[in-house]
Structures are given as C-alpha cells and as structure tokens.
Amino acid sequence: GYQGESGDVKALAMKKWFNTNYHYIVPEIEDDTVISLDCEKLTGEYEETKKLGIKTKPVVTGPYTMLKLCRYVGSKNAEDLADDVAEAYRQLIAECTDKNVEWLQFDEPSLVRDMDDDDKALFHRVYYRVFADHVGCKILLQTYFGDVRDVYEDIINMPFAGIGLDFIEGRQTGELINRYGFPGDKVLFAGLVNGKNIWRNHYDKTLKIIRQLRDKKINVVLSTSCSLLHVPYTLKHETKLSQDYLRFFAFAEEKLTELSELATLAERYNYTELEAYHKNQELFAGTRDCNSNEVRQRLAAVTEADYVRLPKRSERQALQKKEFGLPELPTTTIGSFPQTKDVKSQRAQLRKGVVTEQEYVDFVKSKIKECVKWQEDIGLDVLVH
C-alpha cells in the first residue's frame, strides 16, 4: 500500500495459505477488472530450463482455486468471472502446447475444502470450458492439504491426464480409491512423502500403500503430499545439531532422495535385502530419547469422535462468559505486536555477541511489560504480547 502526498492506496489483504503458516496476497476483482492471459514469465522460464537440458513441468494455481481465493469488491462474483478465467486457462494450455510442454500442472487445493452444490457447479463450469475441444499438453490436477471426498467421483471422470492426491493429510484418500476405483487411462501422482514436515518417511508403511495401489493396476507416480517450499532446502549445512537428531530429519533434497529410494524399493521383489530399506528400518526400530509410551497409547486410542469438540459452542460461550466476564463486544488487538527497529537491532547484537543472552532476555521482558501496560492504559479487554 501507499499513503502520502501522491495518494492513498490501501494494501491488499494477506491471508494464510490454507492450513500452513505461509501467506498470500488476496487478489481483488472489481467490476471493471479484465481477465486476460500473461504467461511470458512461465513460458520464458520453461524455455530457459529447456535450453539447459532440464525437463520441467510448469505449475500454476488452478482456475477453481483462483476464483475461490479472490476477493470480489464490486457487484460481480466468481460465477460472473468463471468463463473469462476459463478462457485464459485455455489460452495457457495452447501456449504451452506450442512450446511442446508435455505436462502442465494445475494446483487446486480448494478442492479439499467442504464443497456445496454451488461450489461443485462452479468447478464443473470452469473446467467444462477449459477442456472444450482440448488437445495438446497433458493436464495434471494436483490437490493437497486434505482429500477430495466431495468431488472425487467427478474428478476421475474428467479429462485430466493425471490426478495428484494427498495420502498424508487426506484421511479418506485411500478409502475413496477403494470405493470408486481409479481410471486405467490416468496417472495417479500419489503424495506419499510428507511435504510439510521435516521428518523421515517410514518406508514400510509407504511401500504397503504403493503395493495396494499397484495391485489395483493403477499407474502410480510417487510424489510429495504438497510442494516442498514448506521445508528447508537441505541438511548438508546443518552442522550444529547432533546426529542423534539429524538422522530423523529430511528436508527438501532428502525427501527427493526418499522418493527415489521408494521408487527403487517398490520395483524390487527382494527390497528387504537392499541397504536403503535396512537403514530406514534401523531408524524406526530404535527408540528416540523423546519417546513417550503414554502419548503413543493416547494417540492410538484416538477415534473420529475425538475430532468433535464438546461441549457445544453455545454451552462453551456461556461458560466463557461466566468465567471471564467479558462485555458483548470485547476489544483486543489483531495479533502479536510488530518487530520494531530496536527489537530487530537488539536481536542482531545478540547474534554478533555485542550483548549477552541475559541482557537480551531482560530487554525482551521490558518490551513485553511496555506492551501489556499500553493495553491496560487504553482499556483493552483481552491482552496479548
């Protein structure tokens, strides 16, 4: 945003990217907004890597997710923009086909959210237009952060060449495949390695799922559950942590190695004799120093009923009102206080050894005290620091 002599331009809203701690800038659609294709960056980067001998798969946010995540500030809504957005994606497919792109990936994480009839109608409408007279590069529909229980049957009957499903956070993904099957003329990009956390994959569990899929004669490509941008790049430069902990970690490069090893193991009848399998078995056979049998037992006993919060919201409201005595419209801040220049400066001095850790702790405590006092002085009902 900008506020100054030249004008007042409000910044676009920033929201969390689904259930991650990453954020995105929310596009705003006004009534006079014109939807058109500008893919110069995407096709340019594809051509650049192609000249280097690197075969890539261009990835873009899909049309349905794009429509669902925009903010409509005028009288128009997603349905009004659906045809124009779909036409832009049709043109993108044509451009990629002209560049001899083999696969074009559409990321559609919005499909894992609860979908009502209007959402399903929008999804069908936009892709009906996208696929009208479709020829050219193969389209991969990639989903993540959950399962697509509301539209799985629809998806498998649409002309996608590949479908990416999340087997980590998608609790019903396996069940959906068992119940409705998976088309023999499509490729399943199976998200079997967690793309969001930094832990090693348990090969035994993953290989079992791979065997089940291949027993169904499904054409499977092993993949991560989502983009690897959510994890650090590599373990190679982690020199300060003990190997006792590092051996359990897998960052982006290590997760790619896991995919490669899993692919090799899955092709071998005698995979239990291979070194990669033995190393993984040893890792999970041992006891971690942070293990708690009590916690493991509690987790094993978790059922679907445990995901239902009790008591009901109306009862919780009454209890909270009685306990805290807050007014009907309590005042608070929207979140934590900003990292001011002096806070950043003090942290930098700590890293350089200019101040001691105790001096830094005392400084932070003084800042917290200032924040709390300021909130008390202006009369906020709920304090944060």
Label for each model-derived stretch:
Residues 1-385:
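Domain-level signal for soluble alpha/beta catalytic cores
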